[in-house]
Amino acid sequence: MINLQDVSKVYKSKHGDVNAVQNVSLSIKKGEIFGIIGYSGAGKSSLIRLLNGLEKPTSGTVEVAGTKINEVNGRGLRKARHEISMIFQHFNLLWSRTVRDNIMFPLEIAGVKKSERIKRANELIKLVGLEGKEKSYPSQLSGGQKQRVGIARALANNPKVLLCDEATSALDPQTTDSILDLLSDINERLGLTIVLITHEMHVIRKICNRVAVMENGKVVEEGEVLDVFKNPKEQMTKRFVQQVTEPEETKETLQHLLDDTASGKMVQLTFVGESAEQPLITEMIRNFNVSVNILQGKISQTKDGAYGSLFIHIDGDEEEVQNVIRFINDKQVKAEVITNV
């Protein structure tokens, strides 16, 4: 559905060239939800502007829904954009128009008959859960409702690809989850390919099939979400994974415990998939002559399974402690002894 081959984007400035996107190659499958994550300045927004043709790449090929976006202009580009739609962080609604009129706006521009515009708008209002708000104005809506209008408007022309540029960044956590649930539902119902740009790993964890991590204009890591959670290779990726797998203030807590612990081992257990549901601690206490203290932990769900991190302190005879660690690894649970934070 989407293929980027050796794509680069260089902006000229009075201080020299700015390499916003550097040699990015990605392949996004039809019907999947693909996440692109990175901190501010990583090149995410520049990349999404290349996908919808708002910018031309300095080099490389951008193909979306069978069209090489970098090679078309004018009418050809406008036609290609009918297959690509977008929602934004700040909604970009027309404040003088009602919910229904906002949704009908792209159809109006496309020259669709009024009766068909109204029919399509009503279908979309039902799809995004805004029944009863048809005649409301944006100023009368909550942030989540405004984004639902934005999603409905983006779907008006039956696009094949939906680009989401930090679409939940301006929302509270509960509303964020409701919007992500809606996007996941739309993906399943319509088979829509969704590309999510975000700096929040929670968004990736909740609904994405695959993820690419960007830093300084480059894709530094890419893969299935659960695989990336399980084995993050780059330091940047590890920091993102820690956002959702470790409780806040983990570093300070562990350092305090390390300083106060005279014996035993502090161990981080990493669970993936079915291993997250094993009664591991019970078996350790039952089968070995050690004491086990649970320090803190967290389990998160991805679309492909559970991922969890648990910090424990194991105390006892050195040989018996090592036996416990081998036992843990035999259970397909990663065990890492923490010596410093």
Swiss-Prot record:
<dbReference type="InterPro" id="IPR003593">
    <property type="entry name" value="AAA+_ATPase"/>
</dbReference>
<keyword id="KW-0029">Amino-acid transport</keyword>
<dbReference type="InterPro" id="IPR027417">
    <property type="entry name" value="P-loop_NTPase"/>
</dbReference>
<keyword id="KW-0813">Transport</keyword>
<dbReference type="GO" id="GO:0005886">
    <property type="term" value="C:plasma membrane"/>
</dbReference>
<dbReference type="Pfam" id="PF00005">
    <property type="entry name" value="ABC_tran"/>
</dbReference>
<comment type="similarity">
    <text>Belongs to the ABC transporter superfamily. Methionine importer (TC 3.A.1.24) family.</text>
</comment>
<keyword id="KW-0067">ATP-binding</keyword>
<dbReference type="GO" id="GO:0016887">
    <property type="term" value="F:ATP hydrolysis activity"/>
</dbReference>
<dbReference type="InterPro" id="IPR050086">
    <property type="entry name" value="MetN_ABC_transporter-like"/>
</dbReference>
<keyword id="KW-0547">Nucleotide-binding</keyword>
<dbReference type="Pfam" id="PF09383">
    <property type="entry name" value="NIL"/>
</dbReference>
<dbReference type="InterPro" id="IPR003439">
    <property type="entry name" value="ABC_transporter-like_ATP-bd"/>
</dbReference>
<protein>
    <recommendedName>
        <fullName>Methionine import ATP-binding protein MetN</fullName>
        <ecNumber>7.4.2.11</ecNumber>
    </recommendedName>
</protein>
<keyword id="KW-0472">Membrane</keyword>
<comment type="subunit">
    <text>The complex is composed of two ATP-binding proteins (MetN), two transmembrane proteins (MetP) and a solute-binding protein (MetQ).</text>
</comment>
<dbReference type="GO" id="GO:0005524">
    <property type="term" value="F:ATP binding"/>
</dbReference>
<dbReference type="InterPro" id="IPR017871">
    <property type="entry name" value="ABC_transporter-like_CS"/>
</dbReference>
<keyword id="KW-1003">Cell membrane</keyword>
<feature type="domain" description="ABC transporter">
    <location>
        <begin position="2"/>
        <end position="241"/>
    </location>
</feature>
<feature type="binding site">
    <location>
        <begin position="38"/>
        <end position="45"/>
    </location>
    <ligand>
        <name>ATP</name>
    </ligand>
</feature>
<comment type="function">
    <text>Part of the ABC transporter complex MetNPQ involved in methionine import. Responsible for energy coupling to the transport system. It has also been shown to be involved in methionine sulfoxide transport.</text>
</comment>
<dbReference type="InterPro" id="IPR045865">
    <property type="entry name" value="ACT-like_dom_sf"/>
</dbReference>
<keyword id="KW-1278">Translocase</keyword>
<dbReference type="InterPro" id="IPR041701">
    <property type="entry name" value="MetN_ABC"/>
</dbReference>
<dbReference type="GO" id="GO:0033232">
    <property type="term" value="F:ABC-type D-methionine transporter activity"/>
</dbReference>
<dbReference type="InterPro" id="IPR018449">
    <property type="entry name" value="NIL_domain"/>
</dbReference>
